């Protein structure tokens, strides 16, 4: 009531616009946005245009599984799991595929995330300029163990990478010399059922049967284990794999066993994979401690 209009009240000053102010608040933000646009375009092109020490890009097929990563080196004909080894200063062209649900491929210190979609090939292009180990992970919720779908990018000097590559291109020994490892190989190929999901080139796979993906996706269900002994993390980079903590000893009964089972991540995985990573595809085989020790001795020999 107090501020109601009264008869003969004076009219307030009327403002009908200020061309100068309107031009300023239009031009200044436009210039700012243009600067941001130019910087964004420059950065986007810079992300995929590298000055590489190696003129030939390294082409790798990256396959997202539940819940681990497969890395297939297309020109080198080798495959690894959970560890992507690359040379420093080389353009990497990663072809991204999924065998099940949507994943997302991301290494925060090297590149932004890119979705990995079933039935749709995607691409991530990057380059690592410093030697070191970089942690990667899935950033798209993909099921129960999404948080445990990790991997490492291991960047080596060109010479170290060439040495690693030469070793990876070799098939596994068909007959281990160590008797415990030999017993583990027989177990792998026999009653344990391991070979039903895993393959080892030179043992139960030919050189052209190493893929989990592509034209013959039925060859393997689990990770390729040809050079398992050279890796340092397993089960989607959830467990450490260190031979020093998985020492195989012979007991008074003449049977092998693991010296310290609690410290051995691979022992825990083989004993009860569902306790380590519930919902994963690896079934419990009810292996005895002796059988686990034999399998560990064999897997360790696969360097």
Where are these regions (language model features)?
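Short, solvent-exposed mixed-charge patches
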Residues: 302-303
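Non-transmembrane, membrane-proximal soluble domains of secreted or membrane proteins
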Residues: 1-193, 199-220, 233-272, 276-278, ...
